[in-house]
UniProtKB/Swiss-Prot annotation:
Sorted UniProt keywords: Developmental protein, DNA-binding, Homeobox, Nucleus, Transcription, Transcription regulation
Name used for this protein in its record: Homeobox protein Hox-A7
GO MF entries: DNA-binding transcription factor activity, RNA polymerase II-specific; RNA polymerase II cis-regulatory region sequence-specific DNA binding
Function: Sequence-specific transcription factor which is part of a developmental regulatory system that provides cells with specific positional identities on the anterior-posterior axis.
One record GO biological process: anterior/posterior pattern specification
UniProt xrefs under PROSITE patterns: ANTENNAPEDIA, HOMEOBOX_1, HOMEOBOX_2
DNA bind region: 135-194
Family affiliation: Belongs to the Antp homeobox family.
Length: 208
């Protein structure tokens, strides 16, 4: 029993060459692919349009979307210009919006001009400034009074406690870090002096 028997039994009302849609205004006859003849199937080639003639203008890639003739133009008396009214208004507003972004209001304000009075009243000390990675730290210079007081303290105490270091820093108008570094350098100098003195005494004893 051939397969055509089942096809005819299941679909008795469909015959070869019959169209799926009835003839209507604005549409062409489109035959079913399953029941089309060989001559009709060969017409669906690469060059054939995928859509009917009235819809080709709407989906044509090469032409504008709204300029092609459609089946709605005749029914509602719409021209191609009516579709471009809203789009033209948006196109005109786009450069206006983009030009607003380049105004001075979008630029970052200079922080130096925000609070000029507050910065003039605020006193910045040299040790409060942020030192960059390429900037060399200058050598700390001490006055004669500061050096004298530090030498006195070092004569009695080689190492300082934190509490004593804070007291000296407030008394001499220095920071704790400066006091700590001075005592570290002074201890290194003292060790070199004692080491040199001990070596000289041993050499003198050997000569005797």
């Amino acid at each position: 029993m051939s397969s055509s028997y089942y096809v005819n039994a299941l679909f008795p009302k469909y015959t070869a060459g019959t169209s799926v849609f009835q003839n209507a205004s604005g549409f062409t006859e489109a035959t079913s692919c399953a029941f089309a003849t060989n001559s009709q199937r060969s017409s669906y080639g690469a060059g054939a349009s995928a859509f009917p003639a009235p819809m080709a203008g709407l989906y044509n890639v090469n032409s504008a979307i709204y300029h092609g003739p459609t089946m709605y133009n005749t029914g509602y008396n719409l021209n191609s210009d009516s579709y471009n009214l809203r789009c033209s208004a948006l196109d005109q507003n786009i450069p206006v919006l983009c030009s607003d972004l380049s105004k001075q209001g979008c630029e970052k304000l200079d922080q130096t001009n925000v609070h000029p009075q507050a910065e003039s009243n605020f006193r910045i000390y040299p040790w409060m400034r942020n030192a960059g990675p390429d900037r060399k730290r200058g050598r700390q210079t001490y006055t004669r009074y500061q050096t004298l007081e530090l030498e006195k303290e070092f004569h009695f105490n080689r190492y300082l406690t934190r509490r004593r270091r804070i007291e000296i820093a407030h008394a001499l108008c220095l920071t704790e870090r400066q006091i700590k570094i001075w005592f570290q350098n002074r201890r290194m100098k003292w060790k070199k002096e004692t080491k040199a003195g001990s070596s000289s005494t041993t050499s003198e004893e050997k000569q005797e």
